Amino acid sequence: MFVVFDLDGTLVDSRADIVRATNFALAAGGRAPLPDQVVTSYVGDGARTLMARATGISESDPDLEPALRVFLDYYSAHATDQTRPMTGALALLVTLHRRLPLALCTNKPRRTTERVLRALGMRAFFQAVS
């Protein structure tokens, strides 16, 4: 039995980096930036859905691919610029890790997830990351 956590919004506050990556991708495609609150309301269903919502392009439309690629590349390079642990998250992980196996389940790309976990000192707490 594992205690399973989500990452964004549960263990880390990644909103600022996601907003910045979204608006960077929009600007690269000649679109206007969106307010932070609008972008954060689009978060939670993966990068493809986020960029579809932000651009107004269907998830299945090939025209979404350039914006998605720009977002993913930018976010991968900047995923830890402003991302921080949620208040109390590290203390909770320390306490639980002493007694229970922990796992992480996220729709964030694996390489980016690993970078965030390592940068914030969280990777060692998890026996499984998916």
What are these regions (language model features)?
Residues 1-41:
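Active-site neighborhood of HAD-like aspartate-dependent phosphohydrolases
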Residues 5-7, 71, 100, 126:
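Conserved hydrophobic/aromatic "anchor" residues
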Residues 17, 46-49, 111-112:
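Short alpha-helical
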Residues 22, 51, 89, 113-117, ...:
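Hydrophobic packing residues within well-ordered alpha-helices of enzyme cores
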Residues 32, 61, 122-127:
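Conserved H-loop
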Residues 41, 45-77, 94-95:
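A metal-dependent, Asp-based hydrolase signature
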Residues 73, 118-121:
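Conserved ABC ATPase "signature" region
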Residues 77-104, 110-114:
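Short, acidic loop-to-helix structural element flanking the phosphoryl-transfer center
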